[in-house]
Every structure is written in C-alpha cells, then in structure tokens.
C-alpha cells in the first residue's frame, strides 16, 4: 500500500515539532498566505482554525464558474522560478498538476501593436530610435546586476529607469505602464518595486529568451482547495462565510477572536487581511501609534472586467497598454495561455485597472463598467463586436495593491505585533518582491513557523494561557 505525501507528513508530525500539549491558533483569512500558515501549523500538530468571510478559500485568487471550470476572478499565473509554490505542491503530491507553457507579450502604443517577447522583438520596436532599442535591450541586463535591493531604496522607479535606459525609453515604455498601474502615485513608486519586476520576469525565460509561465490544472482554486483539504486531514478547521469582527484581550495578550456572537479562544492569532482591516480589528486594544503605523501604507483598489467571448481577440497573452487614454493598463487574453477547451470553447479576456477608491470607474455599477470598457476595446480592436460576448463579469478588490514608495522597507510592520499573541502575514509585508501567491505562501509559512516555535518554547505559566482558560475552540461570547 502506498502512502500519500500528506499522510506521510502527518505521520512525521511529532518530528516536526515538540509541542507538548494541545495549542490552538486562529488564522484570519483563507487566502494563500493564511492557508500556508495554517498548513505549517497543522503539519506540526498544532490545532488551527481558519476564518474566511467569503464562501470559498483562495482570497484574491478566488474563482467563479466558466463552462464548468473554475476561473480566477483576477488573472493569475506563476513564473518558472516561483520555488515556494513548487515546494508546496510537491508536499501535497500534486506536482504533475502544474502546467508550464510559453507565452507572448505585446504592447499597444500609438494605435499599433508590437511584440515584445524576445530580444529580436525589442530590436524591431520602431517607436524607439535604434539607440533607444539598444538601451531597452541592455536595461534588463543592467538591472539584473543589482544584487542588493537596499541600494535602490532612496530612488524612485522614474529616477532609476531613466538612469539605466535614458529619457526616451522611459517616456515610451515605462512611464505609461507606471501611470497606468499607479495613476497619481506613479511618481512615488520605488525603484525596488520595478527592479524586482524585471528580475522576476527575466528569470522565467527559456534558453531562447522566450517567457515561460505556469498554471495549475483546474485553476488556482483547485490548488487552494487541495491545500484546504490537507489542512483538514491534519485536524484543522476552515470556517467559510465567517467574518472576524474583533479580538479578545485578557491579561495583556490576545486570547481569542470574535466572529459575530461567537468567540474562538486562541493561544495565538495570525491576521492576514489588508493592513487597514487589521488596524480596525486591533484599534480597541493597540497603542495609537502602532495603529497609525499600520495605516501608513496606502493601497490601490482594482476593477477587473472578465469577458467570455466566442472567438479570440488577438494572439497575444499579455498586452501592455501604453496609451494614457485607454482606461486599462493591460488586456490579458487568458486563453492564449490556458486553452479555450478548458472553458467549453470560450475565450477569456481580462481588462484590469488599479485605481484609487475615489475614481469614477470604481463607483460605476457593473453594467456601466461594461459599457464604458467596450467603447475603448472597440477602439483598440475595430473588428470586435458585442455579438462576440457570451458573458461578462465585474470583480472588485478594495485592497489590491500596496503603494510601494521610496523607503518602503522602513514602513513594513513586523510579523510580531505589540499585542502578545497576535501575528501578521499580509501582502503589504512581501518585500522587496511584489505581492503574489508564491510570496504569500512563503510569508505564510514563515509566520506559521514562528508561531509554532513560540508555542513550543513557551510554557502555559509564562502567560500564553493559564490552565484555567477555556479549551481551544468555540466558547460563549
């Protein structure tokens, strides 16, 4: 009889940890960061409960049904060098479910389409002068020479990119992308953020220079569900449609989480939502200066229109839009990456826009977003017809992208908070990398390890929780 990797991990639980008595940890949020933290705890024999306000696990990688298959609400892929997700998938025994495929990238500039997937494409990019093309090609190589991101902390992306490639390359290629993504904050964005983008994409190419990306069979939802299943197999609990509404503090430490009328007692709590949400949760208990510190990091929201079409829009997977009059920073044709047969022959197109909450587009009703977007899409693709549309969906995320400004490293809160028993693992703490499922998994696992170690080394009489406290789990409010 063969033993599954998950079962084998459970059998090794005592070797992973020396937790001598039952402990209980509550994880707030079932995105990949929260699930990874819960998995790290559960496989060490720690009792864990995950609270998720949505009706499914996955967080920003949440999904909906298209043609009988789950599709991400917001576009997702992995790079070939995303080792943390690969390690997790191997532990779950589902590495054969990762699909690696070549993709292509393009740019829409001055009402024309250009390929930008290979070095040859760069040399044929006519919006730049011959010297500008050479500078653009060398820019990525020069950027990769930077080994220590700290030397870039004092620079904005504009300053650094102009130094590397000149003003022409910045004006044509980089400025429209920064403005399209960060809007009024484009001039504040750190060079570190852009350096990591170049480093990451440069490391996900084959020997010929073509970009390779990865996807999970059945979508990211399938991986999130498999991870949730593994947590349950190790004794963990995941409660969907359950919003954390507050924290309980006793004896100078966090001892539980409120979920409506219920309270879950806990030896430790890991909070994974966006920092403004965490700030609201802890405000009754935390020092005012710490709450203010959490609120220092600003976020952009995201509106994502997903179109189901009866035919392909173009042959490009990732189309950067370097046209300031176009409201979306990119047109991502998902089915040029994952084939349309996966979705009953439907072609999937994402139109994504990061924006402040005060923006008109954020306030539009869903039908208005569709009408507004189609006008611009038809300008870009004159042959496009509304008759191609088989379905449309508008998804919104209030806290989608932290604004990574200069000296961002000094703004990031530590995993351990001033409130004993409360730990943080959020997308805003992913740095110098940008947020994404690979790094959410990395940070979640690291936090789970920290919490497990605290529970292992501290005794009940040290203040974690006395013997007179309630048993782990649900107690009366």
Regions found by a protein language model. Give the residues of each.
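Dinucleotide-binding Rossmann-like beta1-alpha1 core, especially the glycine-rich loop
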Residues: 67-150
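N-terminal Rossmann-like FAD-binding beta1-loop-alpha1 element of flavoenzymes
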Residues: 23-50
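Extreme N-terminal leader/targeting segments of oxidoreductases
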Residues: 1-25, 43-44, 466-468, 472-476
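Mid-domain catalytic core of redox enzymes
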Residues: 44, 242-349, 354-363, 367, ...
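Glycine-rich FAD pyrophosphate-binding loop
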Residues: 42-66
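Active-site/ligand-binding neighborhood in enzyme catalytic cores
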Residues: 128, 137-247, 272
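Conserved flavin/dinucleotide-binding core of flavoenzymes
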Residues: 3-4, 331-477
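Conserved Rossmann-like nucleotide-cofactor binding loop
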Residues: 33, 56, 276
